Structure formats: C-alpha cells, structure tokens
Amino acid sequence: MQLVLAAKYIGAAIATIGLIGADDKTSNM
C-alpha cells in the first residue's frame, strides 16, 4: 500500500521537477 502511494508521489514529483527544471537540469538521467 505504501509503495503505491510512494510511487505515485515520487512520480508526480519527478514529473513536476522535470517540467520545471527541464532547462536547468538537462543531465538528470
């Protein structure tokens, strides 16, 4: 149960960070 919530939360956070800091952090991967 916690894994699903964590995965969803982390996924949203990564998506937001990716959208916001796309230009700043191009070498994220």
UniProtKB/Swiss-Prot annotation:
Name under which the protein is recorded: ATP synthase subunit 9, mitochondrial
One record GO biological process: proton transmembrane transport
Q: Which family does it belong to?
A: Belongs to the ATPase C chain family.
Q: Where in the cell is it found?
A: Mitochondrion membrane
One GO MF term, please?
A: lipid binding
Q: Which UniProt keywords apply?
A: CF(0), Hydrogen ion transport, Ion transport, Lipid-binding, Membrane, Mitochondrion, Transmembrane, Transport
Q: Name one GO cellular component term.
A: mitochondrial membrane
Reported function = Mitochondrial membrane ATP synthase (F(1)F(0) ATP synthase or Complex V) produces ATP from ADP in the presence of a proton gradient across the membrane which is generated by electron transport complexes of the respiratory chain. F-type ATPases consist of two structural domains, F(1) - containing the extramembraneous catalytic core and F(0) - containing the membrane proton channel, linked together by a central stalk and a peripheral stalk. During catalysis, ATP synthesis in the catalytic domain of F(1) is coupled via a rotary mechanism of the central stalk subunits to proton translocation.
| Subunit composition and interactions | F-type ATPases have 2 components, CF(1) - the catalytic core - and CF(0) - the membrane proton channel. CF(1) has five subunits: alpha(3), beta(3), gamma(1), delta(1), epsilon(1). CF(0) has three main subunits: a, b and c.
